């Protein structure tokens, strides 16, 4: 069993469209363990830190307005290769390039409303988890089905 963690956020469009349970179930069904979850409306400051590499880009003001337009479900998942596999479960950033069966391939059509965010590396995951969650908000617990998932 791996203790690798990733940050997955269901963006305002995913929350407003009632997709939370379907998205969470994709990760649970795969065998990943949920260790952090909260519904938040992020501040501009938090989003500027989260998307620091995009702050100077022309699309950033529109993205910032969208990401502060409603609640986001912030989650932390744990398990073997969860960062890479989380990206596979989500699908390509541009939903039109996402395969059917992925979250974005099934639920999104527009890159500006692509339902979810997922960490793109182990390092990014740790940075994002630290931004969105306090240490005491993450729960270390035993998933009893682990022996049915891992050798």
Swiss-Prot record:
The active site is at residue 117. The lineage of its organism: Eukaryota, Fungi, Dikarya, Ascomycota, Saccharomycotina. GO terms for molecular function: ATP binding; metal ion binding; nucleoside diphosphate kinase activity. Major role in the synthesis of nucleoside triphosphates other than ATP. The ATP gamma phosphate is transferred to the NDP beta phosphate via a ping-pong mechanism, using a phosphorylated active-site intermediate. Its EC number is 2.7.4.6. It holds the Pfam family NDK. GO terms for cellular component: cytosol; mitochondrial intermembrane space. Belongs to the NDK family. PROSITE patterns: NDPK, NDPK_LIKE. InterPro entries: NDK-like_dom, NDK-like_dom_sf, Nucleoside_diP_kinase, Nucleoside_diP_kinase_AS. The gene is NDK1. Its cofactor is Mg(2+). This is Nucleoside diphosphate kinase. SUPFAM superfamilies: Nucleoside diphosphate kinase, NDK. Signal peptide: none annotated. Keywords: ATP-binding, Kinase, Magnesium, Metal-binding, Nucleotide metabolism, Nucleotide-binding, Phosphoprotein, Transferase. One of its GO terms (biological process) is UTP biosynthetic process.
């Amino acid at each position: 069993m791996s203790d690798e963690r990733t940050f997955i956020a269901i963006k305002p469009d995913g929350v407003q469209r009632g997709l939370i349970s379907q998205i969470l179930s994709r990760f649970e069904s795969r065998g990943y363990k949920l260790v952090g979850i909260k519904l938040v409306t992020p501040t501009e400051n938090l989003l500027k830190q989260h998307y620091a590499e995009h702050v100077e880009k022309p699309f950033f003001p529109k993205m910032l307005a969208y990401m502060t337009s409603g609640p986001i479900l912030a989650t932390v998942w744990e398990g073997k290769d969860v960062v890479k596999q989380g990206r596979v479960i989500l699908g390509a950033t541009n939903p039109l390039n996402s395969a059917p069966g992925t979250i974005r391939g099934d639920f999104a059509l527009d890159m500006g409303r692509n339902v979810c965010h997922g960490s793109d590396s182990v390092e990014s995951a740790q940075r994002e988890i630290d931004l969105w969650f306090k240490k005491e908000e993450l729960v270390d617990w035993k998933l009893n089905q682990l022996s049915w998932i891992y050798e």
